[in-house]
Amino acid sequence: MNLSITIIGHNEVDHLRELLPLLKWATEIVYVDCESQDGSLEVARELGCRVFSQPNNTNLNINKSYAIEQATGDWIFYLDPDERLPELFESEIKAVIQDTTNAAFRLNRRNHYFGNWLRHGSQYPDTQLRLFRKDAAHFPNQHVHEKLVVDGSIGKLNNDMLHFPYLNISQFLSKFDFYTGVEAGYLRDSGVRITAGNTLRFLVLKPFFRFLRRYLLKGGFRDGFPGLFCAIFDALNFVVRYFKLWEMIRNTPENKKSLSPEPSPLP
């Protein structure tokens, strides 16, 4: 059985330099570059990837689907540039795809914030569905966070994948700004409006209960300061996306027109 590892990326050159040499055991690596300006495409090509270019779509699933379409393997493992597969994955994946009736496999992921593995606060095991038969799964294209849809039974891998999404706070805030903007767009498209009820939900109730659940009930406090940081911004996500929704609605042409001051009558 052939295995294709598919990756999409935008300005991920440092991660690619570290990640790609660890994946030489795959049949092929398909890298889709999304308008990078840091040399990511050239580095991926130098390190042996089959390289393609696509627009940097905010709906990441569109380019994930494109990467799968370019792959030639019977099996696909989708990987983000900031993820790592420990050495034990090579033997485990090669073994399971040679002798299985499953259409896909889940695995656990260890999320690291600023170099710290977060074991609590709903951050682990953070189960992901990543290994699948090419002809038995697809990414929906409606939403950036929609999961892989699989036609068939799903197994479980034994080893944990590593995830290093945030190396520092500045990087976190940049991604936080991006994803809250995307989520605000989905709120708008799904018909959510600025009302008293929604304001109470998004600015008070949702943040309060999210923080309570993840920091206290799920033990996020046991991960120290990184756990507190994660829980606070996880709760603030609701607040920021709702204010961005307000801004989007306010800046529509019809609302801008209604907010424009009437010209004063000439004397």
Predicted region positions:
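Short, well-formed alpha-helical segments that are part of the catalytic scaffolds
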Residues: 7-25
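Short, structured coil segments at secondary-structure junctions
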Residues: 25, 47-48, 127, 150
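Compositionally biased, intrinsically disordered low-complexity segments enriched in Pro/Arg/Gln/His
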Residues: 261-265
